[in-house]
Amino acid sequence: MESVQELIPLAKEMMAQKPRGKLVKLYVLGSVLALFGVVLGLVETVCSPFTAASRLRDQEAAVVELREACEQQSLHKQALLAGGKAQEATLCSRALSLRQHAS
């Protein structure tokens, strides 16, 4: 069935042949399921831009969180390196001062 215009003559022809009740119920069930599928397809088409936008926002938020974590980690490493260098400088100056006293 390519169009609704072909569906109406088919329904008229079926009613003219006086089909059994079970057959009519089967056709009605098939038609309802097909209509339900069309409605779901339309809803999905209408709502897909919104879901794509929310996915994009979620991805951007995840990227921002990763960048912040990397920045915090690099700052922590820099602080450790700076603290280590200061500690080494203190140890070296102590070692030199102790050596001067020993000689």
From Swiss-Prot:
Any one cellular-component term (Gene Ontology): mitochondrion
Pfam family, one: G0-G1_switch_2
Subcellular location per the Swiss-Prot or TrEMBL entry: Mitochondrion
One example of a Gene Ontology biological process annotation: extrinsic apoptotic signaling pathway
Record function comment: Promotes apoptosis by binding to BCL2, hence preventing the formation of protective BCL2-BAX heterodimers.
Subunit relationships: Directly interacts with BCL2; this interaction prevents the formation of the anti-apoptotic BAX-BCL2 complex.
Name of this protein: G0/G1 switch protein 2
Organism: Mus musculus (Mouse)
Gene this chain is encoded by: G0s2
